[in-house]
A protein has these predicted regions:
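Catalytic core of pol beta-like nucleotidyltransferases
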Residues: 1-26, 32-38, 48-96
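Acidic Asp/Glu-based divalent-cation binding sites
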Residues: 40-42
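Short hydrophobic/aromatic beta-strand micro-patches
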Residues: 44-46
């Protein structure tokens, strides 16, 4: 995936994240290691209501041209959560 393509996809994800009022969105995984060889976009979301998670994921899937793997940061094992928080990159943060 080209960097320009990733940036475009992340802009779409940011817009949808604003609409859903999520707290933060992190990019992690292969896109951070090597954009050119990444097959998908790994993101973690923090502060989304459980009832809205699949609707949010559906909107992202419909809006993006690349496969997106989404995890709820509040609903994953602690060691995975810590890895995302330390190695991931914040791509969206709701204004306080």
């Amino acid at each position: 995936m080209r960097k320009e393509v990733l940036d475009n996809e992340l802009a779409k994800i940011e817009k949808i994240s604003k609409e859903f009022g999520v707290k933060k969105v992190f990019l992690f995984g292969s896109c951070l290691e090597s954009v050119e060889t990444a097959n998908d976009i790994d993101i973690a979301v923090e502060g989304i209501k459980a009832k809205d998670f699949f609707k949010y994921y559906g909107r992202i899937s419909m809006a993006t041209d690349n496969e997106v793997d989404l995890v709820d940061l509040d609903d994953i094992r602690e060691h995975f959560q810590k890895r995302i928080l330390t190695k991931g990159r914040i791509i969206y943060e709701r204004a306080v």
